[in-house]
Amino acid sequence: MKSCILKSINSIYQIGLRGVGSGRQQEFDEAKAYGSNLISAYEVHDIGVKEVLKKIPDGANYYITFDADGMDPTIMPAVNAPTPGGLNWLQVRELIHGIVNKGRVIGFDLVEISPSFEKGNTTIIHAERLICNLIGAMVRANYFN
């Protein structure tokens, strides 16, 4: 089944990676060998979201899997691997809006939130706002007309 699904995927972009902490070097090497485009959080910080968005092909269907570990822990602290240097709120918002405007988002999921690590509601508030931003961007892009 996995190979059938993978055959229908033209390219994969992983944006906001921060080292090998959540994966072994072999997994990164295999992802690159498969053709995945790996863009670290530091590259996003250095070149900016607009330049990252230029690397993603226009006019495609996009499925976004958002890993909460990729955001800075000041924004998403209730994750399994809170590590400084993640993407900030404005960067993630700009990425979401940029992808919505490049083509068609056909699906979205938000993973790696660990409610047992939450102190207050910081993570869940930001997660909810991300989903609302995605839906709002889709409405403004006339997805539902």
Regions found by a protein language model. Name each.
Residues 1-145:
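Conserved alpha-helical scaffold segments that buttress catalytic/binding sites
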